[in-house]
Amino acid sequence: MIVGKVVGSVVSTRKSEKLIGQKFMIVEPVHHMKADLSQIVAIDIIGAGIGEYVLVAQGSAARIGCGVETAPVDAAIVGIIDDGAGLE
């Protein structure tokens, strides 16, 4: 999993049918915890807001964890961090 901060959102009017109704957020991995990533787009099924720190699952864990096993999803916000001492 990646620890990141939600920095924006993405609107997509044309997308796979399996992604209809999904919210897309731009997540910036926390600088000292990132794996050479600058920003990723993740689906958000829990209602994260811009500025919040989140947990992001990737790959099959993202799809299974969000119940979208057959959707073209590579990253999903699976948790909002309430207390992130030392994140910045």
Labelled PLM ranges:
Residues 1-32, 37:
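N-terminal first-folded block
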Residues 14-16, 43-45, 65-68:
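A generic local secondary-structure boundary/capping motif
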Residues 30, 43-45, 59, 81:
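A structural micro-motif recognizing beta-strand termini
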Residues 38-42:
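Short alpha-helix capping/helix-loop boundary micro-motifs
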